[in-house]
Design a protein with these regions (language model features):
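Intrinsically disordered, low-complexity regulatory segments enriched in Ser/Thr/Pro
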Residues: 1-21, 65-114
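Low-complexity, flexible helical/coil segments
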Residues: 43-45, 91-96, 121-125, 146-148
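Ampiphathic alpha-helical segments that act as solvent-exposed interaction surfaces
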Residues: 26-31, 101-138
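Short, surface-exposed, polar/charged, turn-prone segments marking secondary-structure boundaries
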Residues: 33-37, 83-87, 139-141
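Negatively charged, low-complexity tracts enriched in Asp/Glu with abundant Ser/Thr
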Residues: 2-66
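Short, highly charged C-terminal tails/helix-capping segments
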Residues: 135-148
């Protein structure tokens, strides 16, 4: 079974170094930890502490790839909103100079304004090693943004 390092930062942790490094867990244990967090309560704490951050960081023990889900306290909607950041690299060709030259652009998988269900689904993809699914979703969102 694959193992993952888990680090949780609550609003009362003033700096990134204060986050709780909880150790190595299997996939199901990580999902249980994610479900056990009262995200609404974390949101209220974040707002009370003005600028505090709640994050859930998972690192693959083998590849050292990392995925961080952060709760966005200042979302425009009433629903919980998450931001996903990762070090999952994507290299995309980018046409330049009247379409004659193709350059490669390096980017990292990241999403904003994710619902709780979307955040959990992306976490599940990461834990299952389905990085191509994350990359494809990121690319499709980027394409939609370019067309808009």
């Amino acid at each position: 079974m694959k193992k993952f390092e888990l680090e949780i930062r609550h609003p009362q942790h003033l700096s990134e170094q204060d986050a709780e490094a909880l150790g190595l867990f299997e996939r199901t244990e990580i999902l249980s930890q994610f479900d056990a967090i009262n995200w609404r309560r974390q949101l209220v704490s974040q707002l009370e502490m003005n600028g505090a951050i709640t994050s859930f960081t998972v690192t693959d023990a083998d590849t050292q790839q990392c995925l961080r889900l952060s709760l966005n306290a200042y979302s425009a909607s009433d629903q919980l909103a998450f931001k996903l950041e990762s070090d999952i690299e994507i290299v995309t060709p980018q046409k330049n100079l009247f379409g004659l030259i193709t350059l490669k652009h390096k980017d990292y998988v990241a999403f904003k304004q994710l619902s709780l269900d979307q955040a959990k689904a992306y976490l599940n993809h990461f834990l299952n090693g389905q990085l191509d699914t994350l990359k494809d979703n990121y690319k499709s969102i980027r394409e939609k943004q370019k067309q808009a």
